[in-house]
């Protein structure tokens, strides 16, 4: 996948060939090493007592869901807390049944209930679940210009709830756009005057990344702390969420231990020293998409896939010569190692490792009757290599593409088409050939995700890369300033999110695994590429995030 990097500089580098002038980038080394392998003994096994307590508490929460009155603020708050605590996957059927009922009884106008917090929460929960409910019931709190009415001017909880709800707007809902802006500015003003530290932290987190764009696992880690400080919290739910978090964390730690062993055997750090060495960061990426225990096999395989994609990007973008890349691409295209000795040593090492990952994928999927999906996965990896090669040809020939030419290639080189197809190929959920063909056709939701990925990547990497980017090309083509280009591209990111919201409402419930995959991958991009490239430089923000959910228990 394409990840922003610092400016490439030419240097004599001799991995695989002698005295060849190549580009090189001073990436920082792997910061985790064999941490998860060396600390395996510290990652305790889940005891029988913990499993029994976990099951007992889960049943208690189910009873709570059933016993609480339908469509009451307590029921809605309970569902919201369950989901934000990261344990919603245990109660999917119960929550869907409840929200289906709430949707069926959802009024176009609610003349009796004037509680903004409840109305906005209900609106958000239903849209999250894929129900296209109107925003009319929220309109009495917003004037025609999108400003908040005086009646709620100091209702921080209500405005925060409306802010979160407004993030689920779609194109054409201009009133929600205006409400979002009004809520943001009002919340920033109100938290300077509140003495409620917990509420202030909650608002600051929401303004940074709203619920709609938050990774479930990362959000759960933060929300557990906030929920604990809430005097009205449910003790059983809190205990269950903390136990579940720690149990799932141990599973993730053990998975990383096995993956670290694979990584050490590859020894790319020594054999391919020009490439970024980011195994744990790749696992974090995939875990952001699939954190639930049932996706154990998918996490293992997809971490290897994204790791290999990252190295592939560096082969094309940093190290390979044009002649080497031409020959290398032909081998990827054929998906055959016959005659591989024609390639430089570093390419032979890489290609054998790549093909081994797909052999493992085929073996694992054969066990669950999804062998048919592997060809789709391979074809997308081939296509990724082809677009990387196209970009390399542009670089070596000094060709400057038009914005249209660039985006056609760059949406694919963002890697999210490849990762989506590969992910759907290895998850346990049954994905039909018809659904694969639909995804391969690049439907609007996937195109919107790729636009966000590409533009966030280019915005984060602006000024630190010598290759083409949407920022440079837009400035040159439109004759605008850097600030204007950033403003326009951020607007495109915002509109693409609205398209994703729209498609989620349009396509549910038939394509839930596909929608979940696309949305979660897009959320990872928001977390890693807002304001900086936190993958290329994973020593600060990313390290802290990984530590919070993969090292430190709650």
From Swiss-Prot:
A motif (DDXXD motif) lies at residues 313-317. Binds 3 Mg(2+) or Mn(2+) ions per subunit. Its cofactor is Mn(2+); Mg(2+). Residues 319-325, 391-427 are annotated as: Homodimerization. Mn(2+) 2 binds at residues 313, 317. The keyword Repeat does not apply. InterPro entries: Isoprenoid_synthase_dom_sf (IPR008949), Terpene_cyclase-like_1_C (IPR034741), Terpene_cyclase_plant_C1 (IPR044814), Terpene_synth_N (IPR001906), Terpene_synth_N_sf (IPR036965), Terpene_synthase-like (IPR050148), Terpene_synthase_metal-bd (IPR005630), Terpenoid_cyclase/PrenylTrfase (IPR008930). Mn(2+) 3 binds at residues 457, 465. Pathway: Secondary metabolite biosynthesis; terpenoid biosynthesis. Mn(2+) 1 binds at residues 313, 317. GO terms for biological process: diterpenoid biosynthetic process. It catalyses: (2E,6E)-farnesyl diphosphate = (-)-(E)-beta-caryophyllene + diphosphate; (2E,6E)-farnesyl diphosphate = alpha-humulene + diphosphate. The Asp-Asp-Xaa-Xaa-Asp/Glu (DDXXD/E) motif is important for the catalytic activity, presumably through binding to Mg(2+). Involved in the biosynthesis of phenolic sesquiterpenes natural products. Sesquiterpene synthase converting (2E,6E)-farnesyl diphosphate (FPP) to (E)-beta-caryophyllene and alpha-humulene. This is (E)-beta-caryophyllene synthase. It comes from Origanum vulgare (Wild marjoram). The lineage of its organism: Eukaryota, Viridiplantae, Streptophyta, Embryophyta, Tracheophyta.
């Amino acid at each position: 996948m394409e990840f922003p990097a610092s400016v490439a500089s030419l240097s004599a580098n001799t991995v695989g060939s002698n005295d060849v002038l190549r580009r090189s980038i001073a990436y920082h080394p792997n910061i985790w090493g064999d941490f998860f392998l060396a600390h395996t003994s510290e990652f305790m096994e889940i005891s029988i007592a913990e499993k029994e307590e976990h099951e007992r508490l889960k049943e208690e929460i189910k009873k709570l869901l059933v016993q609480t009155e339908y469509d009451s603020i307590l029921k809605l708050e309970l569902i919201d807390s369950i989901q934000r605590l990261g344990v919603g996957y245990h109660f999917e059927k119960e929550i869907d049944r409840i929200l289906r009922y709430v949707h069926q009884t959802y009024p176009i106008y609610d003349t009796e209930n004037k509680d903004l917090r409840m109305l906005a929460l209900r609106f958000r929960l239903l849209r999250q679940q894929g129900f296209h409910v109107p925003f009319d019931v929220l309109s009495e709190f917003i004037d025609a210009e999108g400003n908040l009415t005086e009646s709620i001017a100091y209702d921080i909880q209500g405005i925060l709830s409306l802010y979160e709800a407004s993030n689920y707007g779609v194109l054409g809902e201009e009133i929600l756009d205006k409400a979002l802006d009004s809520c943001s500015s009002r919340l920033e003003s109100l938290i300077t005057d509140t003495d409620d530290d917990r509420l202030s932290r909650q608002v600051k987190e929401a303004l940074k990344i709203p619920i709609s764009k938050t990774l479930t696992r990362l959000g759960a880690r933060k929300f557990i702390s906030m929920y604990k400080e809430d005097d009205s919290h449910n003790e059983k739910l809190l205990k269950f969420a903390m136990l579940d978090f720690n149990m799932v964390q141990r599973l993730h730690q053990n998975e990383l231990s096995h993956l670290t062993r694979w990584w050490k055997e590859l020894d790319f750090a020594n054999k391919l020293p020009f490439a970024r060495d980011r195994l744990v960061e790749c696992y974090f990426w995939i875990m952001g998409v699939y954190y639930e225990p049932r996706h154990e096999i998918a996490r293992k395989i997809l971490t290897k896939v994204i790791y290999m994609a990252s190295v592939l990007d560096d082969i094309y973008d940093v190290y390979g010569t044009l002649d080497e890349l031409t020959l290398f691409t032909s081998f990827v295209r054929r998906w055959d190692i016959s005659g591989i000795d024609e390639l430089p040593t570093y390419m032979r090492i890489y290609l054998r490792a790549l093909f081994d990952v797909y052999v493992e994928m085929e073996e694992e999927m054969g066990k669950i009757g999804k062998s048919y999906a592997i060809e789709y996965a391979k074809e997308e990896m081939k296509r990724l290599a082809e677009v990387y090669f196209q970009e390399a040809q542009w670089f070596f020939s000094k060709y400057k593409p038009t914005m249209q030419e660039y985006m056609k290639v760059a949406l694919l080189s963002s890697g999210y088409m490849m990762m989506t197809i590969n992910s759907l190929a290895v998850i346990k959920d049954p994905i039909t050939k018809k659904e694969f063909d639909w995804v391969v056709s690049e439907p609007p939701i996937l195109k919107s995700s790729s636009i966000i990925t590409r533009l966030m990547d280019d915005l984060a990497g602006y000024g630190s890369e010598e290759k083409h980017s949407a920022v440079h090309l837009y400035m040159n083509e439109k004759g605008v300033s850097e600030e204007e280009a950033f403003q326009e591209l951020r607007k495109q990111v915002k509109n693409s999110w609205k398209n994703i919201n729209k498609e989620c409402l349009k396509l549910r419930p038939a394509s839930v695994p596909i929608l979940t995959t696309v949305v979660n991958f897009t959320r990872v991009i928001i977390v890693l590429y807002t304001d900086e490239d936190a993958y290329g430089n994973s020593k600060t923000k990313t390290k802290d995030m990984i530590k919070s959910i993969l090292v430190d228990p709650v």
